[in-house]
Every structure is written in structure tokens, then in C-alpha cells.
């Protein structure tokens, strides 16, 4: 059996999958906040409980909201302070008596979608999350590509280019500071939060993403104008990503992925921002929703070989 963990700041979820990645069991508990040892104990207990339930020693994959150095096993997960800068791979492997693998949660999202039966034919799968933040994960032939320092796929920290700034109006363009310390990162524009901030700063009034989208479908002139600008901003930025990575398929997740107009408008807007010989990848909505994190974590042990 394959065990997948989605570890967040408030909840830890374990899900158990068979070799076809069909879920057989899941459990959620609160994330310990008092000590690293307590955090390790909770994960250990969940694994032992699953081992007993299924009478086996399952593989353990973990998705975290941060980075894990694959050489040292040390995690950088600042919103889970008890486990931040700790050697989680070494410590969990010793406690559980087996190899433990861990990846950024966006990579797990992408991996889950790459292992869907409808996507397994594609050698290069790019997952993009347009949620609270904007980020992604890159999968080559069923395996996460995270790079030498675990930063591959951190597309939210690419910055607006010439064409994006021109679209937003040069000296009128709102320049947002990112939590990473830089300015004009895609995370602050293409996320749900960025969608709302841009509308506020360009249209002069504050609305939620849901309200903006409702106004768009009601054919409100300012909302229609803004959405078309946002689609163009996405096309410019995602076009750059396609030029660099040339994926066969892009899977969208996060709150804005529920905006159906994206799937109609974005493929039409992309070609003018690509090389003439480039193919526009298939753009699809994520299938597994909230289960994608645990499913992708479990898939860290799968191989197409």
C-alpha cells in the first residue's frame, strides 16, 4: 500500500492508496504546534495505525508547504515552526524503519494529476495552482522534477516581464511586494489574491474573486474589461513558462481554476506569446481537488519503468 501525507499548518491528513492509486482509507488530525518530537510522534502513530489496519508496511510519501532538500532531508516549512529547518526525512525514516520521501505540496498536486489515467500518456505535465498563491509543479515521465535545491516549479517567483508591464500601463502598473522579498513576482498577480488586488487597483473598487466573476458573467463592463486584461496577463506569463518548459499538458488547480472562461480564453490568447513553431499545450482543470496532495505524495513511490 502507498501512504500519502498532506501536512499543513493546521491539519495533517493521511490517505492510503492501492497500486492503482485508489483511496482505501484516510484520517485527519490537528497539526501539533508545541514540539518537533510531538509532530514526529503524530505521523509515526498514523503510519503504525495504517500498517496494522492493512497488515503491511506501506511506503510513506509526504507533501509539505515548503521545500525539502533531498540531499540533507532538511525541511524549510516556515508556517510549521516545530518542523522548520529539521531533518524530517532522516528522523521519520529512523522512526518508521523505511524510506520516507517528501516534496513540496504543489509538486504533489502536479504528480497526482500526472498519474491520472487520462494524463499518463504525456511525458511532460505542468501543474499550476491559481489559489491563495500562484505556483506550480513539473513532472517528467511520472517523476517530480524539483531541481538541485528543490526550487524547480517555483514559478510564482518569476517576475513580470516587459510585455506584462506594458499591458498594465508602465508607470500606472501596480507593483506588489512579494513575501519572498522581491517585487512584481507572478505570485502577487496570477493568484486569487492578486486577481482581487489588481481589480481593486485598476478598477478602483474592492470585490472578491467570486464577485468579480459574477459581474463578468452579468456582462458588467468594468468586470469584462478587467477579466480580458487578466487573461492576457496570464497568457504573457504562462507563455514564458511554456517557452522554457514546453509541457504537453497544463493542469490548473486552486480557486481560480473553477473560472470556466479560463479554459476557453487562455488557449486562444497564448499563441501570440509563443514561438511560431510552438504548440499550445492542452489546458485542463484538476481532477482530484483536495485529494490531490495526499494522492501525489503517495505517488512519490510509483514508477513508469
From Swiss-Prot:
Residue sites binding Zn(2+) per the record: 157, 178, 180, 185
| Entry GO MF terms | ATP binding; N-acetylglucosamine kinase activity; zinc ion binding
Q: What class of enzyme is it?
A: transferase
Q: Which pathway does the UniProt entry assign to this protein?
A: Cell wall biogenesis; peptidoglycan recycling
UniProt KW Metal-binding keyword: yes
Cite a single GO BP annotation.
Answer: N-acetylglucosamine metabolic process
Name the UniProt key words of this record, in alphabetical order: ATP-binding, Carbohydrate metabolism, Kinase, Metal-binding, Nucleotide-binding, Transferase, Zinc
What does the sequence similarity comment in the record state about its family? Belongs to the ROK (NagC/XylR) family. NagK subfamily.
List the PANTHER family: N-ACETYL-D-GLUCOSAMINE KINASE, ROK (REPRESSOR, ORF, KINASE) FAMILY
Question: What name goes with this protein?
Answer: N-acetyl-D-glucosamine kinase
Organism, scientific name: Histophilus somni (strain 129Pt) (Haemophilus somnus)
State the organism's lineage: Bacteria, Pseudomonadati, Pseudomonadota, Gammaproteobacteria, Pasteurellales
Gene name, per UniProt, is nagK
Amino acid at each position: 500500500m502507498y501512504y500519502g501525507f498532506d501536512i499543513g499548518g493546521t491539519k495533517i491528513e493521511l490517505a492510503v492508496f492501492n497500486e492503482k492509486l485508489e483511496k482505501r482509507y484516510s484520517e485527519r488530525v490537528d497539526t501539533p504546534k508545541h514540539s518537533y518530537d510531538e509532530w514526529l510522534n503524530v505521523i509515526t502513530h498514523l503510519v503504525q495505525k495504517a500498517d496494522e489496519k492493512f497488515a503491511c508496511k506501506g511506503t510513506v510519501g509526504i507533501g509539505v508547504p515548503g521545500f525539502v532538500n533531498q540531499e540533507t532531508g532538511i525541511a524549510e516549512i516556515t508556517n510549521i515552526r516545530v518542523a522548520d529547518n529539521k531533518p524530517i526525512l532522516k528522523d521519520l525514516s529512523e522512526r518508521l524503519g523505511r524510506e520516507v520521501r517528501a516534496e513540496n505540496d504543489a509538486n504533489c498536486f502536479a504528480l497526482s494529476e500526472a498519474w491520472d489515467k487520462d494524463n499518463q500518456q504525456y511525458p511532460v505535465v505542468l501543474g499550476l495552482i491559481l489559489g491563495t498563491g500562484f505556483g506550480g509543479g513539473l513532472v517528467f515521465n511520472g517523476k517530480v522534477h524539483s531541481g538541485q535545491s528543490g526550487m524547480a516549479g517555483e514559478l510564482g517567483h518569476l517576475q513580470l516581464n516587459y510585455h506584462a508591464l506594458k499591458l498594465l500601463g508602465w508607470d500606472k502598473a501596480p507593483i506588489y511586494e512579494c513575501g519572498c522579498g522581491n517585487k512584481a513576482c507572478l505570485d502577487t498577480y496570477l493568484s486569487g489574491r492578486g486577481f482581487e488586488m489588481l481589480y481593486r487597483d485598476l478598477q478602483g473598487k474592492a470585490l472578491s474573486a467570486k464577485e468579480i466573476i459574477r459581474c463578468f458573467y452579468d456582462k458588467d463592463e468594468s468586470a469584462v474589461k478587467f477579466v480580458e486584461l487578466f487573461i492576457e496577463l496570464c497568457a504573457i506569463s504562462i507563455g514564458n513558462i511554456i517557452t522554457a518548459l514546453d509541457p504537453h499538458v497544463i493542469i490548473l488547480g486552486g480557486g481560480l481554476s473553477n473560472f470556466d472562461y479560463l479554459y476557453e480564453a487562455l488557449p486562444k490568447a497564448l499563441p501570440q506569446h509563443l514561438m511560431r513553431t510552438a504548440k499550445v499545450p492542452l489546458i485542463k482543470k484538476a481532477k482530484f481537488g483536495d485529494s490531490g496532495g495526499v494522492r501525489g505524495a503517495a505517488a512519490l513511490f510509483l514508477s513508469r519503468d
